[in-house]
Amino acid sequence: MSLDAVGSLETKGFPGVLAAADAMVKTGRVTLVGYIRAGSARFTIIIRGDVSEVKTAMDAGIHAVDKAYGAALETWVIIPRPHENVECVLPIAYNENVERFRESTERPLIGSSQNRS
């Protein structure tokens, strides 16, 4: 069982998923691990990270979709510790393409004024 949470957000319209993804990685110490075109004008993004960070990022993503012109939030979910069987089958695992972003989110923050970039 993974210790990292997984969050998934689905929108109608690409601008909404783009706004959500950007807000999520800027707000929470999370890694964007996947993107799925779920159908005509429906898009899903998947984030991973600490449970509290995924919750913070998801809130920011939902808010960003609400602000994006013409976008609609379809659904979202947070799984605190997905079972390894779920990680093995569904496209939610970290991969080599996103590993450098994962490493940057796992570095400890020192002091409250440190930039999260």
UniProtKB/Swiss-Prot annotation:
It comes from the Bacteria. GO terms for cellular component: carboxysome. It is found in: Carboxysome. Residues 5-91 form the BMC domain. It comes from Halothece sp. (strain PCC 7418). This is Carboxysome shell protein CcmK4. GO terms for molecular function: structural constituent of carboxysome shell. Belongs to the bacterial microcompartments protein family. CcmK subfamily. A probably essential, minor shell protein of the carboxysome, a polyhedral inclusion where RuBisCO (ribulose bisphosphate carboxylase, rbcL-rbcS) is sequestered. Hexamers form sheets that form the facets of the polyhedral carboxysome. In PCC 7418 there are several CcmK paralogs with presumably functional differences. This subunit can probably make both homohexamers and heterohexamers with CcmK3. Both hexamers can also make dodecamers, formation depends on buffer conditions. Crystallizes as a homohexamer. Interacts stably with CcmK3, forming heterohexamers that can make dodecamers. Heterohexamers have a 1:2 CcmK3:CcmK4 stoichiometry. Upon expression in E.coli forms large aggregates. CDD domains: BMC_CcmK. PANTHER family: CARBOXYSOME SHELL PROTEIN CCMK4, PROPANEDIOL UTILIZATION PROTEIN PDUA. GO terms for biological process: carbon fixation; photosynthesis. Keywords: Bacterial microcompartment, Carbon dioxide fixation, Carboxysome, Photosynthesis. The tight homohexamer forms a small pore which is positively charged.
